[in-house]
């Protein structure tokens, strides 16, 4: 129980400390006052070691330098690169110890690893290097590598920690135990168990070896193709690691290229399917277009025929309408003004009738007789005869008086026939002079009456 508690405390302390605090870790373990191992009684060998002066030894110097220099001067670049890294150059990037496989030595027992004594368990040595404990071959029992147990009950005089319980008939298989240097290096990772799990994930233990390199079929093919042979045991050199990373990068590139080609093929297949569907649809549309063009041509022919028929009917109707319009216009201009009830009456306008002298047949006869009488030789000498004129005017039976009355009667009859007798008479009297009326009513001597008749006839003509 005490052993497990001490081991758990030491593991937790190693996990919580950084590599820089290596001195504090040693103080935490071996301090007399507050150390974890202060209650553990050391063997006689440790007491003699205190009293005796330790002689310088190159092995002990290497051990001390590895312990003291691991926290202060860690190597700037790791000797191995992470397993999942892609880069061929591993010197520039620091690596996590949980991704780096621990170095393993050959299958034979090194100088620092001593065989187990009879009756005692496997021993752990503080000598720097690999601490693989070897026992006699026997039945193998697989023990998880993540569990680290250290028995602190007994210290051997030689400075080795040995278990008290006797060896079982079944021995443990060869496995890699952790040294103080591994504990110090594992402090930077933060988890000792993850370190072992990561190493066991990348590598697998082989028969008689601590670790074995596992290659896939593709990696083996590429290595054989390039003529490169990698060892099956770890650790690998930097050149071999770069070659392995290069091979794995080629495999990843090949897989990505295959994926891209697959996607490209699927895309091209989809495009070809769409193109075939579009081609079929295009052909169907072309057939429809040809059918529609034929229908359009037939409709255009029918439209032309209809336009010709409409033009002919329109010209005929226009001619008929023109004729009818001309007839109606002529009828309106010629007939309507004559029958219009609102038009002015021509008979009522005073300007339509002009005064005209009308001579009766009697007057013409009298004038002709007078002209004939004046032309006979030996007629009466001309001269005024006022008495005779007066007598004629006064006597009612004289021919002058008869002519005057007949002229007045004829004028009255003619005015009664024309509906406007008074107006015609007035115009006639105004047109005739007073002298002419006096001459007609009371003519003078025969010469004067004949001359007056000729003048009247000349005026009439």
Curated annotation (Swiss-Prot):
<keyword id="KW-0325">Glycoprotein</keyword>
<keyword id="KW-0256">Endoplasmic reticulum</keyword>
<dbReference type="GO" id="GO:0000976">
    <property type="term" value="F:transcription cis-regulatory region binding"/>
</dbReference>
<keyword id="KW-0010">Activator</keyword>
<keyword id="KW-0805">Transcription regulation</keyword>
<feature type="glycosylation site" description="N-linked (GlcNAc...) asparagine">
    <location>
        <position position="427"/>
    </location>
</feature>
<feature type="region of interest" description="Disordered">
    <location>
        <begin position="370"/>
        <end position="408"/>
    </location>
</feature>
<dbReference type="GO" id="GO:0046982">
    <property type="term" value="F:protein heterodimerization activity"/>
</dbReference>
<comment type="function">
    <text>Transcription factor that may act during endoplasmic reticulum stress by activating unfolded protein response target genes. Activated in response to cAMP stimulation. In vitro, binds to the cAMP response element (CRE) and box-B element. Activates transcription through box-B element. Activates transcription through CRE. May function synergistically with ATF6. In acute inflammatory response, may activate expression of acute phase response (APR) genes. May be involved in growth suppression. Regulates FGF21 transcription.</text>
</comment>
<feature type="modified residue" description="Phosphoserine">
    <location>
        <position position="173"/>
    </location>
</feature>
<feature type="topological domain" description="Lumenal">
    <location>
        <begin position="344"/>
        <end position="461"/>
    </location>
</feature>
<feature type="glycosylation site" description="N-linked (GlcNAc...) asparagine">
    <location>
        <position position="410"/>
    </location>
</feature>
<keyword id="KW-0735">Signal-anchor</keyword>
<dbReference type="GO" id="GO:0005829">
    <property type="term" value="C:cytosol"/>
</dbReference>
<dbReference type="GO" id="GO:0045944">
    <property type="term" value="P:positive regulation of transcription by RNA polymerase II"/>
</dbReference>
<protein>
    <recommendedName>
        <fullName>Cyclic AMP-responsive element-binding protein 3-like protein 3</fullName>
    </recommendedName>
</protein>
<feature type="region of interest" description="Disordered">
    <location>
        <begin position="51"/>
        <end position="120"/>
    </location>
</feature>
<keyword id="KW-0804">Transcription</keyword>
<keyword id="KW-0597">Phosphoprotein</keyword>
<keyword id="KW-0238">DNA-binding</keyword>
<dbReference type="Pfam" id="PF00170">
    <property type="entry name" value="bZIP_1"/>
</dbReference>
<comment type="subunit">
    <text>Binds DNA as a dimer. May form homodimers. Interacts with ATF6. Interacts with SYNV1/HRD1; this interaction leads to CREB3L3 ubiquitination and proteasomal degradation.</text>
</comment>
<feature type="topological domain" description="Cytoplasmic">
    <location>
        <begin position="1"/>
        <end position="322"/>
    </location>
</feature>
<dbReference type="GO" id="GO:0000981">
    <property type="term" value="F:DNA-binding transcription factor activity, RNA polymerase II-specific"/>
</dbReference>
<comment type="similarity">
    <text>Belongs to the bZIP family. ATF subfamily.</text>
</comment>
<feature type="domain" description="bZIP">
    <location>
        <begin position="243"/>
        <end position="306"/>
    </location>
</feature>
<feature type="glycosylation site" description="N-linked (GlcNAc...) asparagine">
    <location>
        <position position="420"/>
    </location>
</feature>
<dbReference type="GO" id="GO:0016020">
    <property type="term" value="C:membrane"/>
</dbReference>
<dbReference type="GO" id="GO:0000785">
    <property type="term" value="C:chromatin"/>
</dbReference>
<keyword id="KW-1017">Isopeptide bond</keyword>
<dbReference type="GO" id="GO:0042802">
    <property type="term" value="F:identical protein binding"/>
</dbReference>
<dbReference type="GO" id="GO:0002675">
    <property type="term" value="P:positive regulation of acute inflammatory response"/>
</dbReference>
<dbReference type="GO" id="GO:0006986">
    <property type="term" value="P:response to unfolded protein"/>
</dbReference>
<dbReference type="InterPro" id="IPR046347">
    <property type="entry name" value="bZIP_sf"/>
</dbReference>
<feature type="site" description="Cleavage; by PS1">
    <location>
        <begin position="363"/>
        <end position="364"/>
    </location>
</feature>
<dbReference type="GO" id="GO:0000977">
    <property type="term" value="F:RNA polymerase II transcription regulatory region sequence-specific DNA binding"/>
</dbReference>
<dbReference type="InterPro" id="IPR051381">
    <property type="entry name" value="CREB_ATF_subfamily"/>
</dbReference>
<keyword id="KW-0832">Ubl conjugation</keyword>
<dbReference type="GO" id="GO:0005783">
    <property type="term" value="C:endoplasmic reticulum"/>
</dbReference>
<dbReference type="GO" id="GO:0000978">
    <property type="term" value="F:RNA polymerase II cis-regulatory region sequence-specific DNA binding"/>
</dbReference>
<feature type="glycosylation site" description="O-linked (GalNAc...) serine">
    <location>
        <position position="379"/>
    </location>
</feature>
<feature type="glycosylation site" description="N-linked (GlcNAc...) asparagine">
    <location>
        <position position="413"/>
    </location>
</feature>
